[in-house]
Every structure is written in structure tokens, then in C-alpha cells.
Amino acid sequence: MSGDAQPSSNQRATEARPPPSPPLVNEKAAIGALCVVCGDRACSHLYYGVAACHGCKCFFWRTVKSRLNYVCRYGGNCSISTAGRNACRYCRFHRCLFVGMKIEAVKMDRKLTKRKKEKTDEDDTDDGGSHESFETTTDAKRAKFDNSLLISSLQLIDKTSSAGNAKLSTLHFVQPSLQNLLDEPELLDGFRSEMSYRATRQADEQLCYDSERRLVTWAIDWCRQTAEIADVHHTNDKISLLRASCAPLVLLELGCQSSFGPSDTQIPFCNNSFLSAHCIPPSTSFLRWKTIQSLNKWAQRELKPLCLRAKEIVLLKALIALNPDANGLSSDAESSIRMLRERVHTALFQLLMENSEPITAASRLAQILLLIPQLSLMGVDVIEQVKVRNTFNKRSAFGEGLLFWQLYGDIFDDANDDSYLEHSASCSPTDSQYTTDSI
């Protein structure tokens, strides 16, 4: 029947009102009841938001998809029922809208169908492109897996370096070289206590020494294990990495703990003690007052607003430990370190991309990388303080602070070789206190 067909006389009405509901039909009919448009038996599930029969569903879909316009010559008051639902398409369509059928549902369905068709056409007409796309996807998945494995390895290094393993150490009886410490990590077992930053008491001279030993041991473990991941096995190369990154690594660890802590004026140590930015530290501390203030300010202004996640911190530590510009690196070690550092960069950016939009991820990556030169500058202050302390305090140089002495020497010795061993042999105190309780 045509769209402008005249309905029968019993379909006409004289009052201007919405199309009446079909007899015995509830507009909120349950699924499987009657069609809310014409009163016919509805299908077993909703169509476009309402219970409708197959005929009304197809009529509504076809009208919306084809953008058809109908005209009613009798005022839009035709009754829509099972017997006469095709008599006036205008009233039938408006009845569909009145009972709640959603036009946007048809448009969404049309878009999905179009996308599926376009995807099928691309697959049929561009087999080469599909193969390349598959290879690209496979490479991306492999790279993502490799990055995840790298992050897991670095997290394990951080966990084992911070864990407690305090056994009797032979360092109480000998003064080994850095080469001995890197070749035989068990020599430092006596100083691998559990690292805890609860900051319950002000650090005195002895607590500063204890924390210093533990932090340097932690840095040694970090550098040694990251070098092994990079396939750098020569001990001299490991020593070069350690000297270049020990101070920045320690400062990053202390800065992160300061930003996490409840106080914004304290630098917590790993033995539950702390130094205050408002108090002058002990004269034998490896951190001078100016460095404490700078570190505290940096932690509160730079680190705290960033809210670094655990994985981001681990990757930042790896970037610091993997310094390809460290003095004394062999060419092979420099190349290996640089390659692993690039992998860490990629893993960090991938991690940021998983949590934010590309622009935000790129901006956050830049903010994180800018932390490294700031740490390096503060690290220079630490090294200068250690050298001055080692020059005028024999207990620091050859007893409690032996590890830092081996790394940086004093103002007369830059500790680039093992000359500090000869110097320590001639200048070590004869008091048995330092030979039995050294470091």
C-alpha cells in the first residue's frame, strides 16, 4: 500500500491526540510480551530500546536508515493495530517514536556495520598491507613484553638491594678493595640490614655512619646488578659506574623517602633516623647542612608534585646507574651501557603511555628526565663533603666511612686507582677499635 493511502473509516478520528495504544498493550511490556507499537507478538528481546515485533522493528530501521518522510492525510490520528499497521506509515513511525524507539540506536548500528565493511574491504584488497600490519603488531607485542621483563628485573634488583641479610661480615677484620667488594658481594652481608625510613629519632654521629654504610652498600648492589644486566662483567667498568652514580642514587633514594614522609623538613635515613633541614648535622655526616636544605627543597618542590609511581622510580634509578659517560669505562662497556639505557628510556615511555595520553606522557617523561641533572649537581656537593671529611677525620676515612673513602678518597687523592690502600696502610689509626669495628 502506498504511503498516502487512505485508511478505512473506522481508523479515522476527529480529535487531535497522540496515536492511541493498541488494545491490551502495556508500553512497558516485558520481553516476550506484545509489541508496544502494533500489539502483535513481540520478539524475545528488545529492539531499539522497546519490546517490538519483527515487522515494526524492520519498518523503523528501514525508515531511519533511508531517511524516509511520510505524510498522513487525516491529521496524524490513525489507529495502529495488527490488522491496519500498514495503512498509514506516518502514524506508524510516530507511534514507534512515541513508545520509545531510539533513532540513535539505528545510527550506531549503521556505523558499526560500515566499519566492519570497510575493514573487510581492506583485508580483501590489501593482503600485503595486512601482512605488514601483522608483523608490526607482533613486533610491538614483543617489545612490550621485553620492556615488562626489564622492569620486573629492575624491581627485583631494588627489592633485593633493600632487603635485610645482616650476617657476620669479614669487613670487621680486613679492609678489602672495591674490586674485592664487587667480585665477592658476600663481603658486605654484615651491612645489608633491612632498610626502614620511619624517622623516629634525630640522627647522631653513629646513626649517620650506620646509615651511610647501608646506603653505599645499597648503591653498590644496584650498580653491580644493573651492570650485569648490560653484560658488563669487567670489575673496573663496574667501579667506574659506581663512582659516577653512587652519590646521585643515594640522594634520589633519600629524596623519594622525604617526599613520601609526613614531614616536609626532614631527610629520613634507612635506619629509622633523620636529619632536619633546620638543624646542623653532625660534623662527620656525609651530607652537609647546605646539601640537606637543597635536597629537602628539591624533594618537596620537584618530586612530591610528580607523585612518582614505584615502577617510575625504579626506572629512574636505572637511568642514573647506567651512566655511559662515567670516567674510566671501556669502549665495549660504554656501548653496552648505552644500549641498555635506551631500553630503559623506552620502557619508561611505554609505562607512561599506558597510564595517560601521548602528550601527557611525553611531558611527564621530560619532567622525570630533568630530575637527573639536578641530582648530579647535588651529588657533586656530597663528594666534596666526603673528601673534606676524609681529609681531616681519620675515623671517617679508615673506619666508619671506609666505603666512601674507597670511592672518592680525600682532597689529596681522587681515588681513581687503588692508591688509597697504600695511603690507608700508612695513615690508618693503630687503635684496634677501627680495625675490629671498621665501617
UniProtKB/Swiss-Prot annotation:
It is found in: Nucleus. Residues 1-22, 112-135 are annotated as: Disordered. It comes from the Eukaryota. Residues 32-108 bind DNA. Its main location: nucleus. Residues 1-13 have a biased composition (Polar residues). Keywords: DNA-binding, Metal-binding, Nucleus, Receptor, Transcription, Transcription regulation, Zinc, Zinc-finger. Signal peptide: none annotated. Disulfide bonds: none annotated. Belongs to the nuclear hormone receptor family. Orphan nuclear receptor. This is Nuclear hormone receptor family member nhr-97. It comes from Caenorhabditis elegans. The gene is nhr-97.
